[in-house]
Amino acid sequence: MSDEMICLEEEANVAVKHVFRAELLNAIAKNDKGAFKKCVEQIGKDWHVSRTVETKDKYKFREDLWESRNAILAHEYTWNTYNDKKHYKAYSYRSKICFLLNPVYYKLIYDGLNKKALTEFYKSINDTRKVDKETWQETVEHYYSKLPFSPKDETDIDRIFREDFKLWAKDTVKTWIVKENGHIMYKRGLTPESAQELSV
């Protein structure tokens, strides 16, 4: 009988979110604009959204996020609007920074994977709502109302990070570390129930 099953990809994903969040918040606490912008740059590279901001606009983009840090923390920043004067959209990139800084409010990252997963979720319950960036926050709030979990404060952040992973990764084959009778095994599958032991 299995004592414990851990999803390797989930733990890695959640850990990275915690690390990035800590780096952003530490930079804000120290009023270190350079460290903040460096972290934003690294997030863009690691999460493959750097390309959504043209090279000539990257400095301005990171500067804008730094100037918007308090608005993001106070959930007064809207990432899904386009300002002609700033010449960039980068909706998913901005959503990721908002989510990391203020997960209790923003709750889910806006990107293609989560959009697809939410669209499929609403189809499965015969809800015809349109899932798009304009209605994203409203849709996310409604989605969370269907979960047996309602984030209230910072003690819920780890769970929020996990919910984000579980949504976009639900159709992804994962690696499971299984501790069984004092031994460790590795399995692959969509879920713990369907996972099969790796064979050499």
Regions found by a protein language model. Name each.
Residues M1-K86, V104-V200:
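An N-terminal alpha-helical hairpin/helix-loop-helix interaction module that forms a charged
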Residues Y93-F99:
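Short hydrophobic alpha-helical segments that form membrane-spanning helices or hydrophobic packing faces
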